[in-house]
Amino acid sequence: MAKLIMVQGTSSNVGKSILVTALCRIFKQDGYKVAPYKSQNMALNAFVTKEGGEIGRAQAVQAEACGIEPSVDMNPILLKPEADSRSQIIVNGKVDRTISAREYYEYAPLLLDTALAALNRLREKNDIVVIEGAGSPAEINLKQREIVNMRIAKEASAPVLLAGDIDRGGVFASLIGTIDLLEPDERYYIKGYLINKFRGDASLLKPAIDVLEDRTSIPVLGIIPYLRNMAIAQEDSVYLDECKGSLGETDLDIAVIRLPRISNYDDFDALATDGASVRFVSKTAEIGNPDLIIIPGTKSTIPDMEYLEQSGLAETIIKKARKGTHVLGVCGGYQILGKMIYDPHKTESETTELKGLGLLDTETTFEKEKATTQISGQVKFDSGLLSGLAGCAVSGYEIHMGRTRLFSAQPAFHITKTPKGPADYLDGASNAEGTVLGTYIHGIFENAAFRRGFLNAIRRHKGIPERQADYFDRDKEYDKLADIVRASIDMEKIYAILNEGIR
């Protein structure tokens, strides 16, 4: 059975996911067979495994860092918020039910056995499993029925590293406060602290570290620097506030609409590696004059279309599109680009039909069953944003309940393969000029040749030189991350904690 180590945090967005990714890569570099695990994840950034199951995107990234194929066992319970107090519950990769936060509070303990069974399957296949917690273990209003932090640590006998974010301030109060709110038997599982996102001279922290260690009898095992220019997907939507949008010199400006229920916003991270500045905007005044407007995925298409209307963003997007600004919609954003959205089963809200932006001659109807599959195929259309790309290979994954019907709009992609075998269907739509494009393919910009051709089509339209292809190696990004974190933490002590476990 695999040995375990767990990363918990003092709050959300302290960097648990990226630290787990780093540890996964470090253990892989050291020759171990390693896998990530998070029993319960609340996220709208989702990934589809080869089996067609949904998991949190963070666990897919961590699996990639491990050099293994993502599986539903890595995230057996996924909560996808549909409103402020209602979520769709994904269990073992498939939709289980949609319930309120209060109902889930009662339901969650019933899923503990499911979560532990998935962990045990991972332990049987690997040398090490790196577990990620969620939020904070000291959320005292939730801890009696939680199945993601101390409950998992205790059930699995997993030693815990507690991470805190020093960049936001108050890290020592957060660490001491978290320990103080834990029960004595829970504190026993905390074997070390990781101070994350530090900028400056680490030696200046010594007096505070001495106090922290004296008061809690738990050692600080690392001070990790604030990571810059890392082309690795981030999970928490708080990241959108911090996103600076580019890696290197840029010649294109891309504005991504920050929908209230935005999902899979990491679809566009790769664009920042190819000379584009990617910024998230939520007000009309922030749009400016971009070369491309992107309407991203959303868990609730109809409510977010209503938001676009009420905020004035819809009018602005339509005006700019009519003046020639390129517009791309992905998944829910693709549905929004059409003329009408129908929800006869009230899947998303009480609204059964709503006008879209009308930039594509399409209509979308929500069905009861969700489509979740990996896909591969080729570009079919050859104009505008897809100019010169006909026949270019693409791959990615689909997660949607809507079915989109095309009228005068032109199909954009031809899907030829899924994990089940050969396929033959069309995806996406473009207007005749190719200036407005929609697709259901998540992860499409991970395809380097397509990404470069897509951006160069915009450059040609703009009248600026095309860029030659640079090979972007995400594997090197994981090694870069691992090297930085390895140099910042006491791996000898972490290995000792890993080997000793909980006794």
UniProtKB/Swiss-Prot annotation:
List the cysteine pairs that form cystine: none
One GO BP annotation of this record: cobalamin biosynthetic process
Question: Which keywords does UniProt give here?
Answer: Cobalamin biosynthesis, Glutamine amidotransferase
* Active site residues of this protein: C331, H442
Membrane-crossing residues?
Answer: none
Task: List, in alphabetical order, the Gene Ontology terms for molecular function in this entry.
Answer: ABC-type vitamin B12 transporter activity; catalytic activity
Q: Which residues form the GATase cobBQ-type domain?
A: 251-450
Pathway listed for it? Cofactor biosynthesis; adenosylcobalamin biosynthesis
The domain of life is Bacteria
Q: Does the keyword Ribonucleoprotein apply?
A: no
Q: What is this protein's function per UniProt?
A: Catalyzes amidations at positions B, D, E, and G on adenosylcobyrinic A,C-diamide. NH(2) groups are provided by glutamine, and one molecule of ATP is hydrogenolyzed for each amidation.
* UniProt similarity note: Belongs to the CobB/CobQ family. CobQ subfamily.
The name on file for this protein is Cobyric acid synthase
Question: What gene is this protein translated from?
Answer: cobQ
